[in-house]
Amino acid sequence: MEGMDVDLDPELMQKFSCLGTTDKDVLISEFQRLLGFQLNPAGCAFFLDMTNWNLQAAIGAYYDFESPNISVPSMSFVEDVTIGEGESIPPDTQFVKTWRIQNSGAEAWPPGVCLKYVGGDQFGHVNMVMVRSLEPQEIADVSVQMCSPSRAGMYQGQWRMCTATGLYYGDVIWVILSVEVGGLLGVTQQLSSFETEFNTQPHRKVEGNFNPFASPQKNRQSDENNLKDPGGSEFDSISKNTWAPAPDTWAPAPDQTEQDQNRLSQNSVNLSPSSHANNLSVVTYSKGLHGPYPFGQS
């Protein structure tokens, strides 16, 4: 078999290797896959076109071009920390994918690096998110807003870190998504978002009989009642009994007024039992305010 390989005409091998070159999209995808998604489709097309769309020659040309010693950043995929990871998701549903990555190299990442979509299914319109420059061995979480496809099924896509000059580096991050009508991933992330928002809002201190469902006027009246003496006061009791109007009129009832005055006069008499004259004068003074004087006006 090996002798047969040696006897083959190199020109024939060249023609054989170029079979199917009309399907350039397939060659570009295969070239990108063999390189571990280190090159974008436009770069793959450049090397393939330079080598007459020969896949093997294009790969060799790429490595010859990249042979100079270039300091490439390092990135290691740590774990998928997506909320609800592993759950299926309904069609046409927004969700967030979050990955934990680490700068596993000895140098800090250059500025302007990003996490970029490189192949497979693209979920939504976001194809790139900027990532801050990580120090050596530093770990960070990167989130991407996505949307599930409109049809049920299994989907997969690939993302990679990329420098500002277009150089891909680090591990390939895979997105494997199960789309089902009864999926719970969207609901799980919404509930988690509500819980996070509630826990981060400042809470107001509630005192007394504050009712969050009552009108502001009722809450203010409740606060005013709390400021009063809980046991009441003798002055409040007297003022309410003496000056409170009758239910059907604004003025005190005449009978009630006369009874109060007679009781006040009697109390005055009882306070001075030593002198009958003084008692009469006090009674005369009290009666004189409202009617005839039984003993004459003094």
Curated annotation (Swiss-Prot):
One of its GO terms (biological process) is negative regulation of DNA binding. Transmembrane segments: none annotated. Pfam families: N_BRCA1_IG (PF16158), UBA_4 (PF14555). One of its GO terms (molecular function) is ubiquitin binding. Residues 199-277 are annotated as: Disordered. Keywords: Cytoplasm, Immunity, Innate immunity, Nucleus, Phosphoprotein. Residues 262-277 have a biased composition (Polar residues). It comes from the Eukaryota. It is found in: Cytoplasm; Nucleus. Residues 242-255 have a biased composition (Low complexity). Signal peptide: none annotated. The modification Phosphoserine is found at S215, S222, S272. The keyword Electron transport does not apply. Induction: Expression is icreased in presence of dsRNA such as poly(I:C). CDD domains: NBR1_like, UBA_CF106. The keyword Phosphoprotein applies. One of its GO terms (cellular component) is nuclear speck. SUPFAM superfamilies: UBA-like. Expressed in lung (at protein level). PANTHER family: OVARIAN CARCINOMA ANTIGEN CA125-RELATED, PROTEIN ILRUN. Negative regulator of innate antiviral response. Blocks IRF3-dependent cytokine production such as IFNA, IFNB and TNF. Interacts with IRF3 and inhibits IRF3 recruitment to type I IFN promoter sequences while also reducing nuclear levels of the coactivators EP300 and CREBBP. Interacts with IRF3; the interaction inhibits IRF3 binding to its DNA consensus sequence. This is Protein ILRUN. It comes from Homo sapiens (Human). The gene is ILRUN.
